[in-house]
């Protein structure tokens, strides 16, 4: 509210790891009363086969290892370390835990259980969701459908669970190949369009690109305002249903 926003209409939004962070908030009883919509782009707390959360014991083990690398024994000592040292030791920790050493922790309070269990129990925030992927997220190898990839599978799985709770979910796929590149619709490529910042991109954007960006900005802002992306749009974006399923394509 101090910045002119509406505290009674809060949308959390994230992309990739940011989407995972946003998603986990929708499972916390401390956060859900303050959240009214969620936008999750190319990421989900359940997007990989291994659980993306730690038990308290696992988190303590990682913390102990980090203390060891830093040569300290308490959080107070960590806080006194130079930022450069923290970055160096964090990079070193990543080599020991390549599948992300820093994760949400199931502590029974902030996060009462794992997201997969809470999803099955209907324990997600009962709000509208907008979520999707890019066509070439994570560069799925040729011959394998990107629809088999973790991001897409997680989005559809979560959408199905939400529908059982009568929660609207709007799924999308960003299929637009960016100009000036043969990398297709790669991971993060949609961000120039959803934020309407094409003029800050070095690529030779065309009128077609600007029109697509305008369409996406309209949908995203409409969803933020009212939990429905269909205000002032040319084509209706239908919510997901288990029976037929609808995924809007941005191409």
Tell me what each language-model feature is:
Residues 8-10, 72-81, 171-173, 231-239:
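Surface-exposed patches in mature extracellular/periplasmic domains of secreted proteins
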Residues 29, 70, 82, 227-228:
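A general structural signal marking secondary-structure boundaries and capping sites
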Residues 89-90, 101-140, 146-174, 179, ...:
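Serine-hydrolase catalytic core
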Residues 136, 153-156, 160-251:
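Mobile gating loops/cap/lid regions near enzyme active sites that modulate substrate access
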């Amino acid at each position: 509210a101090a910045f002119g926003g509406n505290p009674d209409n809060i949308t959390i939004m994230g992309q990739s790891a940011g989407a995972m962070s946003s998603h986990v908030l929708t499972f916390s009883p401390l956060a859900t009363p303050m959240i009214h919509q969620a936008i999750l782009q190319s990421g989900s707390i359940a997007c990989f086969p291994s659980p993306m959360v730690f038990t308290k014991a696992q988190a303590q083990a990682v913390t102990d290892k980090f203390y060891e690398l830093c040569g300290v024994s308490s959080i107070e000592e960590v806080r006194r370390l130079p930022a450069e040292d923290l970055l160096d030791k964090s990079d070193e920790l990543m080599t020991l835990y390549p599948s992300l050493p820093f994760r949400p922790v199931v502590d029974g309070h902030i996060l009462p259980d794992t997201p997969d269990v809470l999803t099955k129990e209907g324990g997600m925030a009962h709000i509208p969701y907008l979520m999707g992927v890019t066509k070439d997220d994570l560069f799925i190898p040729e011959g394998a459908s990107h629809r088999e990839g973790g991001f897409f599978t997680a989005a559809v799985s979560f959408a199905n669970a939400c529908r059982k709770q009568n929660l609207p979910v709007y799924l999308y796929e960003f299929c637009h190949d960016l100009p000036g590149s043969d990398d297709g619709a790669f991971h993060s490529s949609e961000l120039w369009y959803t934020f309407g910042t094409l003029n800050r991109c070095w690529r030779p954007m065309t009128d077609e690109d600007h029109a697509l960006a305008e369409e996406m900005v309209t949908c995203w802002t409409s969803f933020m305002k009212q939990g429905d992306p269909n205000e002032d749009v040319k084509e209706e974006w239908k919510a997901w249903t288990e029976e037929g399923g609808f995924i809007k394509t941005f191409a």
